């Protein structure tokens, strides 16, 4: 019988965690790697995309190294993790904004205004009362107008990792359907983002 394995990678705020499972759901190995962050002042929480991506690669390597020769039997990978955040990238998948999760509250005045003006629309169209991505994008474009000119796509952290790992064209950037409501840019009935 063929030895089929699957790897899952959790893109957490503090740690990247990976697990490899067999077809019976048994965990064969697990690995973790810390994620660096910067907290220069209250309400400011920065995680640089390249640092996050480096942690992902190191964690995956720990997992495959622990598997030894069985690493060749990993048939698929799945990514899960942080949902309430935002990252904008340029046309080459370079981080423009850093990963800005809900701990980074610099966007709050923009979120408050958007919710005051569009709360019903967000709930009825996007299915959310916490539209993180659109308020964070408005904040970033307002506070960093020059940097924002480089933005090609806005993604969740899993989309960033998938894009960089797969070296896909930026036009093929994706978002997991389970995360779409957090964006504030989604029409959940039409499954459009």
Model-derived regions: residue spans:
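N-terminal glycine/serine-rich phosphate-binding loop of ATP-dependent small-molecule kinases
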Residues: 1-98, 108, 113, 150
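A generic structural signal for ordered alpha-helices
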Residues: 2-3, 30, 34, 118-119, ...
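Gly/Ser/Thr-rich active-site cleft segment
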Residues: 11-13, 121-193
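Carbohydrate-associated surface elements
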Residues: 104
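Glycine-rich phosphate-binding segment of PLP-dependent enzymes
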Residues: 111-117, 192-193
């Amino acid at each position: 019988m063929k030895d089929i394995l699957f790897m899952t990678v959790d893109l957490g705020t503090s740690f990247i965690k990976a697990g490899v499972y067999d077809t019976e759901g048994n965990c064969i190995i697990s690995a973790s790697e810390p994620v660096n962050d910067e907290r220069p002042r209250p309400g400011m929480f920065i995680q640089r995309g390249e640092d996050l991506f480096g942690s992902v690669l190191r964690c995956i390597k720990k997992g495959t190294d622990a598997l030894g020769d069985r690493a060749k039997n990993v048939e698929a990978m799945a990514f899960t993790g942080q949902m309430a955040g935002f990252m904008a990238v340029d046309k080459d998948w370079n981080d423009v904004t850093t990963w800005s999760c809900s701990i980074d509250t610099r966007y709050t005045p923009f979120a408050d205004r958007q919710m005051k003006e569009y709360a019903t629309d967000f709930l009825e169209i996007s299915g959310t009362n916490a539209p993180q991505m659109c308020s964070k994008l408005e904040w970033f474009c307002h506070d960093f107008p020059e940097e924002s000119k480089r933005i090609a796509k806005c993604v969740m952290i899993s989309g960033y990792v998938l894009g960089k790992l797969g070296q896909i064209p930026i036009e093929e950037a994706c978002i997991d359907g389970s995360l779409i409501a957090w964006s504030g840019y989604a029409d959940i009935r039409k499954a459009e983002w």
